[in-house]
Amino acid sequence: MIKLFNTLSKRVEVFKPIDDVVKIYCCGVTVYDLCHLGHARSYIAWDVLRRFLIYSDFKVKYVQNFTDIDDKILKRAKEESSSMKEVSEKNIIEFHKDMDSLGIMRPDSMPRATNHICNICSFITILEDKGYAYSRDGDVYYSVFKNKNYGKLSNQNIQEQNINKQGRMANEENNKKQNPQDFALWKKAKNDEPFFDSPWGRGRPGWHIECSAMVKDELGDTIDIHLGGSDLIFPHHENEIAQSEAANGKKLANYWLHNGMVNVNGQKMSKSLKNFKTIRELIKSGISPMTLRYFVMTVNYRKPLDFTEEALRSAAEAWKNINLALSFMDLTKGAFRSIDKNESIEEEYKEKLSFELSQKKLKFSEALGNDLNTAGAIAIIYDLAKPLKNFLNQFQRIEGLKIDLNEKFFLLENFKTLEKLTEVLGLKKEVLVKERKITEEEISSLINERLKAKKGKNYAKADEIRNLLKEKGIELIDQSKEITTWIRV
């Protein structure tokens, strides 16, 4: 059973798909710049949802759009002395690079607004014919007061909104709109802007109508799940509902899911506030893509995610341990490839282990099924990784280590389960570069050098050696003044 918090009903609901294929639409990026951590947070959350639905034997059709015509794109094109198309094409390529690096599955379809102009115009015409839209001098607006259900997603009071907006609008806009709260479906082209031909003259679509038209064209009138950031609830998603349900006479989406924002010093991370870190910058600074992915999943998708250096360091340490366990087969040099046919495991032990692992899988599914509790799912991952990591520390230090047959079977089955469940979270093994940069002889030599430094009261040198080894994945354990052991972390 999968339960999800539905923004529309304001409660957690059992997920019930419309038919055999779960239809999901996710609001995509406006392609004028590189993606930041806030984008990563959103698309990682929805990637986990998609992977978990597939793991739970659902068929999924996942659509995510590109907004490739917008004021921000036009502004960037002007700044770069290029065209709207050049700016969007360049940033679509960069978007894919970033998402691929984070292990985010590519959507089944990624429609672009500029490829749906005919559908958008048809959609607006339907709204006009039904009395929900009106044109003024080349602009077309949606009449909010014609829709009695407007505000049902965001709980906005349209009467109060209307009073508050009165007087804040330019006279020209006031003269065109029937009510200040009405929003643009089609915008008349300015002299220096790209344009598309339409029944209302040259212009371009409004932001909200793009998604309504693409949802209908790609997935139909009613979909299972609509996704986006909490900053899109109003006005974007509220306006989508108003447009689509007025035009189609049907519910737009059964479930509305929204992720929380990434905060920096208590403020939302955003390009407008100039307090953002791009995914590219973070990775270039030495943070691995899977560390970023792990970091995002440590907090439930609906809650704010506080971006701090300390939290990132903690995520890096935690991911390093899981990654070590995922590298189990590589680091054991083939010793665990299989159980020999002549080796027999007691059936009673097999059944016991099978039951224990099935319980862990069940708890994993229960965690993700409880409104995508990724932190709970990670706890199960840690439980599976721990014995593998502990064994690796012994295996790498003790030459000719003898392995009990039951232990071998236990570790192999644990590893297989770990691999399967980390795939559901989209966590993939990263190359252990540091593990290959230092030998056991070098470790012993540095430990001896450190002991000499400590005896000579050169504690700065001793700390320098400890930190050097830690950077290479070696944690020192001082058992006494004379004895220091180590483990790989």
Curated annotation (Swiss-Prot):
Annotated positions binding Zn(2+): 27, 211, 236, 240
Motif annotated as 'KMSKS' region, chain positions: 268-272
Binding site for ATP: 271
UniProt xrefs under SUPFAM superfamilies: Anticodon-binding domain of a subclass of class I aminoacyl-tRNA synthetases, Nucleotidylyl transferase
EC number: 6.1.1.16
Location within or outside the cell: Cytoplasm
CDD domains in the record: CysRS_core (cd00672)
Gene3D superfamilies linked: Cysteine-tRNA ligase, C-terminal anti-codon recognition domain, HUPs
CC terms in the record's Gene Ontology section: cytosol
Major localization listed first in the record, in broad terms: cytoplasm
Cofactor names: Zn(2+)
Entry keywords, A to Z: Aminoacyl-tRNA synthetase, ATP-binding, Cytoplasm, Ligase, Metal-binding, Nucleotide-binding, Protein biosynthesis, Zinc
Entry annotated with the keyword Metal-binding: yes
Source taxon at top rank: Bacteria
Single GO BP term: cysteinyl-tRNA aminoacylation
SMART domains registered for this protein in UniProt: DALR_2
Reaction(s) the record says it catalyses: tRNA(Cys) + L-cysteine + ATP = L-cysteinyl-tRNA(Cys) + AMP + diphosphate
Cofactor notes: Binds 1 zinc ion per subunit.
GO molecular function: ATP binding; cysteine-tRNA ligase activity; zinc ion binding
Motif, 'HIGH' region: chain positions: 29-39
Family according to the record: Belongs to the class-I aminoacyl-tRNA synthetase family.
Subunit architecture: Monomer.
Family annotation (PANTHER family): CYSTEINE--TRNA LIGASE, CYTOPLASMIC, CYSTEINYL-TRNA SYNTHETASE
Protein's name in the database: Cysteine--tRNA ligase
Originating species: Prochlorococcus marinus (strain MIT 9312)
